[in-house]
Every structure is written in structure tokens, then in C-alpha cells.
Regions:
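Helix-turn-helix DNA-binding segment
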Residues: 1-38, 63
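Residues within the DNA-recognition helix of helix-turn-helix
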Residues: 40-43
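Basic, Lys/Arg-enriched C-terminal extension of HTH/homeodomain DNA-binding domains
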Residues: 46-66
């Protein structure tokens, strides 16, 4: 998404976490493993400069990406 480098799947992942869906359930919904969800989440956090999943969700919500 723009110069941030978040894909549509990244935004879906963050939106699901924002709803309170567990990492493993997000993985099942996206047809990937929970480990892959965690790896993607770490990449998202690194790209946007935050330390935690909660911060990543808040970052995306503040920018109305999710």
C-alpha cells in the first residue's frame, strides 16, 4: 500500500487481529500456518517501525487502513 509496502494480505491480517481473532485462526482463514502469520506480522512491524502486533494494529487503524 503506497510507499509503506503493506500488501492487501498484510492489511487483512491486521484487520483480523484488530477484531480479536487469534493468530492461529487468522492462519486458517488465510490458508497459511500460524507460524507464517507470526513471520508476516514481524515483517509488518519492521516495515512500519513498531515493536508489537498491538502497535501495528493501532498504527494501521490510525491511518484508516483497516
Amino acid at each position: 500500500m503506497g510507499d509503506i509496502g503493506l500488501s492487501a494480505d498484510d492489511l487483512v491480517l491486521l484487520a483480523e487481529l484488530a477484531k480479536g481473532v487469534t493468530v492461529d485462526r487468522v492462519g486458517r482463514r488465510l490458508d497459511i500456518s500460524g507460524r507464517t502469520v507470526r513471520r508476516r506480522l514481524r515483517g509488518i512491524c519492521d516495515r512500519i517501525g513498531v515493536a508489537t502486533a498491538i502497535e501495528a494494529v493501532a498504527w494501521a487503524a490510525r491511518r484508516r487502513l483497516i
